[in-house]
Amino acid sequence: VLEDSGDRPRDFDIDVNGTRNVLDACVAAGVEQLVVTSSGAAYGYHPDNPAWLDEEDALRGNPEFAYSDHKRQVEALLAEYRQSHPALKQLVLRPGTVLGAHTRNLITRLFEKPRLVAVAGSASPFVFIWDQDVVGIIEQGVNQDRSGCFNLAGDGALSIDELGDLLGKSVMHVPAWLIRSGLWIGNRLRLTQYVPAQVNFLRYRPVLSNRRLKEEFGYIPRKTSEQVFRFFMAAARQRGQL
């Protein structure tokens, strides 16, 4: 569930119990390989995240952010099945922000605002991966019968100020406490779908290293993070969304 439905038990049932159902079905049917699109969100949004997250770094999630917490729990479940059912190969992909010609979601709507909002004192940048690179990675993983866990991101990262420059929009650097207060009021008045807990989503973004993707998996993303964003931006402007 990409966007919180407001019914956390329902979302948990879909995300975590649904994954368990798929795993059980794979084991029962003798499936040899399972490809799972997890998320960089499984690492969590934490102030002590390393500058570049490697696949060996801890998956901590955030209990206050259902999407991140459920991704962490799904990954824990996958790890259990890797131990108990080693015959089922798992290829687990952890993408950063996926963008393509037609992407529109909770993240891209941040870029549609007249001005971008940043948390004062936070330098946490964005990493992007082109949706067609995600397709290529899955295709290569299936064709080569690969297993393992890999971050998906284009080369480089972009700060919120760099995104503002590309979009031609100003960036407001607002204290975290003020953003939380504004989101609390806005959410109570149904003026925004964002909630106070999502401040850390902007403040401590997981920045994914793609070293293992390139060196071990053997896939070189066709677009860098900046090229992905420029491609998305051009397509969104054609649709009148930016």
Regions found by a protein language model. Give the residues of each.
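NAD(P)H-binding glycine-rich loop region in Rossmannoid oxidoreductase-like domains
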Residues: V1-N17, A25
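Catalytic helix-loop patch of NAD(P)-dependent Rossmann-fold dehydrogenases
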Residues: D13, N49-V92, T97
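Conserved Rossmann-fold NAD(P)-dependent oxidoreductase catalytic core, especially the SDR/UDP-sugar
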Residues: N17-A66
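Substrate-positioning beta->alpha
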Residues: N21, Q73, T103-L106, V119-V142, ...
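Active-site beta-alpha turn of Rossmann-fold NAD(P)-dependent dehydrogenases/reductases
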Residues: V35-S39, R94-G96, A153
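NAD(P)-dependent short-chain dehydrogenase/reductase
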Residues: R82-D131
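Conserved C-terminal active-site "lid" loop/helix of NAD(P)H-dependent oxidoreductases
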Residues: D131, S159-E162, L189-I220
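Mid/C-terminal beta-alpha module of Rossmann-like enzyme folds, strongest
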Residues: V135-Y194, N210, R230-M233, R239-Q241
